[in-house]
A protein has these predicted regions:
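Extracellular hydrolytic enzyme modules, especially secreted metalloproteases
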Residues: 231-398, 415
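A generic structural micro-environment signature
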Residues: 7, 124-126, 307, 326
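Ser/Thr/Gly/Pro-rich low-complexity, disordered linker/stalk segments of secreted
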Residues: 22-83
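Short, linear, compositionally biased motifs with a strong N-terminal bias
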Residues: 10-13
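Bacterial N-terminal signal peptides that target proteins for export
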Residues: 1-7
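Zymogen propeptides/activation segments of proteases
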Residues: 20-23, 76-224, 230, 236-243, ...
Length: 528
């Protein structure tokens, strides 16, 4: 029996597409095995034409006194040196690549992505509000690769990720001439079957890459040498339609076309409307919230809202939840931008703000395998500044980031286990055991393979304990199953947490507590 590789088919944006409007049946996580591919970025594009056809990881210093006093001392004061046109996967991405057999936009270095504007004979970029195709391309260029000053709040994709990664990720790329889709907007809108939709988008990608073949060498968009285009972005001119099963919203997918272009494959791509740039109503720059969120998916990050619509375990206030703010420490750990210190003893601990430093700590069970793929608490000093400032100041999709300084705490359960083929169900089920040593895990077996077991969407989780989530906000106010994060969820000076009678999933007693003793604009101190 040939092994069925599975990856999430559609990663949707939380804004406008809306988790309550997403049909879970069109977002299944099964897809056939095929060649993999991945996405990247480059420089700028030229003419207008329409086609027919870590920083250093955080370090801790213990004093000789007891209890220990530990300060996380890493900051982003110096920008790492990035080799132009060279990128690489984080550890999380490398393992995920083996698990899903799919490419990702590398999260470290200088990936090069291909941004393709797509219009329709019955809905052009002029009808979408641009003065011309060239004007549309210039606006797309600004949204993706525009330079921003430190005091500007309306980030481009590139400027956001340079700041969020502390200079460890510099996404560059080209915006190509406009490509005319082979069918009308009305035709595509009439298609409601998700498999047909992605086949049609494959057709648009195929047409675009063939049309542009004499203009670009697609090897330039494979910066990590895996023979996969780092990433493709399709920006379509048609209106957003987030109702029912329309394809005209924003999502990320992995193509399985067998075509090669200059010898490289196509794998991750994102699809979103030009109209998303209007959502914030900004006059100085396009709104890039949706672009930034979907690019997180291109790098392998999951959605943290619930597609079933029952809950929002992570509280809604993160770039991978409701498209707002900076990435939380968990995301940065996955993408290789921070290396959290693990708390192993009682003491006093100090953090600098995550917006300006790589400081964060992990609280974990004895079984912790020193990787992203386990169960742990991850703690960070949250401040409503830097990449959090815009969304802490103004609402986006009726939500605002936390507006207070304090300790933000998440519980993570990103363990991997073997999925085993069940012939009766014609699907894969979890064998109820976890893999602690992923470096020696079997990714080649025909009848089982490692996969992340938990999800924030119950129907996507392989864990029969449906209350076990991938990542959840630990509320200082004691709220559970949070829908929208509130300031009271942040641990401010004088607040504390006690794990009481809680246990880790393996049955080990948590048996820890912490108290926030000091919060300034520059640091936060807590006792453990």
């Amino acid at each position: 029996m040939k092994k069925l590789k599975i990856i999430p088919i559609l990663f949707a944006t939380a804004f406008l597409a809306g988790c309550n409007n997403i049909n879970p049946s069109s977002s299944s996580i099964s897809s056939p095995s095929s060649n993999s591919s991945s996405a990247t970025s480059g420089t700028t594009a030229s003419s207008n034409a329409t086609s027919n056809s870590t920083t250093d990881s955080a370090t801790s210093t213990s004093s000789s006194s007891s209890p220990s006093s530990i300060s996380s001392s890493s900051t982003s004061s110096s920008t790492p040196t990035i080799e132009e046109g060279v990128s690489k996967y984080s550890h999380f991405q490398s393992i995920s690549n083996k698990s899903r057999q799919a490419g990702f936009l590398p999260s470290l270095g200088n990936p090069n992505i291909l941004v393709i504007p797509v219009d329709f004979s019955d809905y052009t970029f002029v009808e979408a509000g641009a003065k011309s195709n060239e004007a549309a391309r210039e606006r797309i260029e600004d949204a993706y690769f525009g330079e921003r000053n430190d005091d500007e709040l309306h980030e481009s994709l590139r400027s956001y990720y340079k700041k969020s990664s502390y200079g460890q990720l510099d996404i560059t790329g080209v915006v190509t001439p406009v490509i005319r889709a082979p069918r009308t907007y009305a035709y595509y809108k009439s298609i409601t079957n998700s498999s047909t939709q992605t086949d049609l988008i494959d057709g648009i990608i195929r047409l675009a890459l063939k049309t542009l073949d004499s203009t670009y060498d697609y090897h330039d968009f494979d910066t990590n040498g895996d023979n996969i285009i780092d990433a493709i972005w399709l920006v379509y001119s048609g209106p957003i339609d987030n109702g029912g099963n329309s394809m005209f919203w924003a999502f990320t997918y992995w193509s399985y076309m067998e075509d090669k272009f200059d010898g490289v494959d196509v794998s991750p791509y994102a699809w979103a409307a030009y109209k998303f740039f209007d959502e914030g109503g900004y006059t100085d720059h396009p709104d890039a919230h949706t672009t930034i969120h979907e690019t997180g998916h291109l790098m392998g990050l999951d959605d943290y809202y619930d597609y079933d619509g029952y809950r929002t375990p992570a509280g809604g206030l993160d770039m991978m939840d409701n498209n707002i703010g900076d990435h939380m420490a968990f995301n940065k750990y996955n993408l290789g931008w921070v290396k959290p210190e693990t708390i192993t003893e009682s003491g006093t601990y100090t953090l600098k703000p995550l917006t300006s430093s790589t400081d964060c700590f992990i609280i974990a069970p004895k079984s912790y395998n020193d990787s992203e793929f386990w169960e742990y608490y991850i703690v960070e000093y949250y401040r409503p500044d830097g990449l959090n400032k815009l969304d802490a100041t103004t609402k986006y999709s009726n939500l605002k980031m936390f507006t207070v300084n304090g300790l933000r705490v998440y519980h993570v359960n990103q363990k991997m286990g073997y999925l085993v083929y069940n012939q009766r169900k014609n699907s894969y089920v979890w064998n109820n055991s976890y893999i602690s040593d992923l470096d020696s895990a079997d990714f080649e077996s025909e009848d089982k393979y490692p996969y992340i077991i938990n999800s924030n969407t119950s129907s996507y989780s392989y864990n029969t304990k449906k209350d076990t989530t991938l990542v959840s906000l630990i509320s200082a106010a004691g709220r559970t199953n949070t829908q929208d994060g509130k300031n009271s969820d942040i641990f401010t000076e004088g607040t504390s947490y006690d794990s009481k009678n809680l246990t880790w999933e393996d049955g080990e007693s948590m048996n820890f507590s912490f108290s926030v003793t000091s919060v300034t604009d520059y640091s936060l101190t807590f006792t453990f």
